[in-house]
A protein has these predicted regions:
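Signature of the first transmembrane helix
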Residues: 3-63, 96, 100, 152-157, ...
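Interhelical loop/hinge segments that connect adjacent transmembrane helices in multipass membrane
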Residues: 1-3, 7, 143, 170-171, ...
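Helix-loop junctions and terminal segments of transmembrane helices
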Residues: 25, 58-75, 138, 254-292, ...
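Membrane-interface junctions at transmembrane-helix termini in multi-pass inner-membrane proteins
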Residues: 69-72, 125-148, 332-363
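Hydrophobic transmembrane helix module of multi-pass membrane transport proteins
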Residues: 51, 86-223, 229, 431
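N-terminal membrane topogenesis motif
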Residues: 1-24, 75-78, 82, 204-220, ...
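Membrane-proximal transmembrane or re-entrant/amphipathic helices at the cytosolic face
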Residues: 428-481
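Alpha-helical transmembrane segments of multi-pass membrane transport and lipid-handling proteins
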Residues: 82-110, 114, 158, 162-165, ...
Length: 481
């Protein structure tokens, strides 16, 4: 099987797994929002946002360093993973427990303060599971990770559904999320060991090397998480819990949808690492294909969320959450920008330029927080969404400049431009159909089908890649894992 086919098969596994996880996650959000309401769901989202923000402080750039180390020829991948994983667990748990203690010094309500203890356990498991993805990506076996992720999401949904009958509040629901995170971690560990046999070990010299190599990436991760979570965190400080709850659904959709291009970028990193030093033409082709696919995906998200945002939120969470529609419309554009930024960030790391990533993220973070502080106090959740667009646009521009400083340029933008035009046509058709009384779900389906047809006919995405992905999903599901 050619490398393109292997990558496409793995991307099909990623898309299938993420789609399944998204469906289950959406069902969980539906259950949570309809049961808890804006205020209690606001507590739930604030805990997860606070814990996620704290978790990244302990990241140390270990994920990208480990993936890069495991992608190099002649390296004992099991030794790399066996030493890096306990370092990740210890650093994450320590920082999260400290953050949970610090939460008691903040003006948060008691449910949030107690919830941060559960959040610390949740994100210790989630960070470990995300770290283990490096093992699956290094050998291009993504379907196994998808299995762990989907199973964890199903367990969380089952726990939430059971707790609804007891009229539980936000804290027990966080317990259900913890149960799902533990199950996903256990499955990931078992499956990863079958692909890359490893034993937990503590080689202090390796720990020191990984930490030093990861410092620029750690700074970049901290800045990136500050941009990603800063909107919700500042919203929780400047606005009541109900506003956080209303913003929580668009924010959750942002998290779910941006995970797909993040996974694609991670899949491409081994190939980009090898070609960056030896074959500039192949490097440019691989980067171009990845950006094309990411642009097509990003435009698809915009036309899926923006035209019928109020009805989509009503369908997901009920009429009480429809007030978050303007924020969802704005944030859909941030999703498209974030996907492209993920690709460029991984590309710079593959080129051995983590300091440029840190520099770019520092500039973007400064722009983001200027927007957050300027917009959130005045415009609430709409200001948070607009600030996110500023953050992602700044990051994309900064990463593009950094790539040029690394000696590479962005490949042709013809295919992304085709995707934008196709999306505009599809969105116009949706609006036309809706204006004439067509049910919005039918109009959305017609517009989506038209968009897919246009990007295929205009070759905005390579046909071979499309054929392989569709064939893999149709014929073999997760068999390639």
């Amino acid at each position: 099987m050619s490398r393109l086919r292997v990558l496409a098969a793995n991307m099909a596994a990623v898309i299938t797994g993420k789609a399944a996880t998204a469906v289950v996650g959406l069902a969980t959000v539906v259950a949570l929002t309809r049961h808890l309401g804006p205020t209690e769901y606001g507590y739930y989202r604030t805990v997860l946002t606070y814990s996620a923000f704290a978790a990244v402080l302990a990241d140390s750039g270990l994920y990208m360093v480990t993936l890069r180390e495991m992608s190099q020829g002649g390296v004992d991948a099991g030794r790399v993973l066996g030493n890096a994983l306990p370092l990740r667990l210890i650093s994450t748990a320590s920082v999260l427990l400290a953050a949970a203690g610090f939460a008691w010094l903040t003006p948060y309500d008691p449910p949030v303060k107690w919830g941060t203890l559960i959040g610390a356990a949740i994100y210790t498991c989630l960070q470990a599971s995300d770290f283990i993805i490096a093992a699956f990506q290094s050998v291009l076996k993504q379907a196994r990770n998808a299995l762990a992720e989907v199973t964890g999401a199903v367990v969380t949904l089952a726990g939430v559904s059971a707790l609804i009958f007891t009229h539980a509040g936000a804290l027990p629901m966080l317990g259900a999320a913890l149960l799902g995170a533990v199950v996903a971690l256990v499955i990931s560990l078992r499956l990863a060991r079958r692909l890359v046999p490893f034993r937990m070990s503590c080689d202090l010299s390796l720990w020191r090397r990984y930490l030093i190599a990861g410092l620029p990436l750690a700074g970049s991760q901290i800045l990136g998480m500050a941009m990603l979570r800063g909107d919700s965190l500042l919203l929780s400080l400047f606005q009541p819990a109900a506003a956080v709850g209303l913003y929580g659904v668009p924010s959750k959709l942002f998290e779910v949808t941006t995970s797909v291009p993040y996974q694609l970028a991670g899949l491409m990193m081994p190939a980009l690492t090898m070609s960056a030093a030896s074959d500039r033409a192949e490097f440019s082709r691989q980067l171009g294909r990845t950006l094309d696919a990411t642009a097509v995906y990003g435009v698809a998200v915009v036309i899926a969320f923006a035209p019928f945002a109020d009805r989509l939120l009503t369908l997901i969470s009920g009429e009480r959450f429809a007030a978050g529609a303007p924020a969802l419309i704005v944030i859909s554009f941030a999703i498209a920008l974030a996907g492209l930024t993920h690709v460029l960030r991984f590309t710079l790391v593959a080129c051995g330029k983590p300091r440029l990533v840190l520099f770019a993220d520092a500039i973007a973070c400064a722009c983001a927080f200027a927007a957050y502080f300027g917009l959130i106090p005045r415009f609430s959740l709409l200001g948070a969404a607009a600030g996110t667009v500023v953050a992602e646009a700044s990051a994309l521009i900064a990463m593009t400049v950094a790539l040029r400083r690394a000696g590479h340029s962005i490949p042709s933008l013809i295919n992304p431009a085709k995707a934008v035009v196709a999306g505009a046509v599809a969105a116009s058709v949706m609006k036309y159909l809706a204006d004439f009384g067509t049910p919005w779900l039918l109009a959305l389906a017609v517009g989506g089908a038209l968009y897919l047809a246009l990007v295929v006919l205009t070759r905005a995405i390579p046909r071979e890649l499309l054929h392989v992905i569709s064939g893999t999903v149709r014929k073999s599901g997760v068999r390639h894992g």
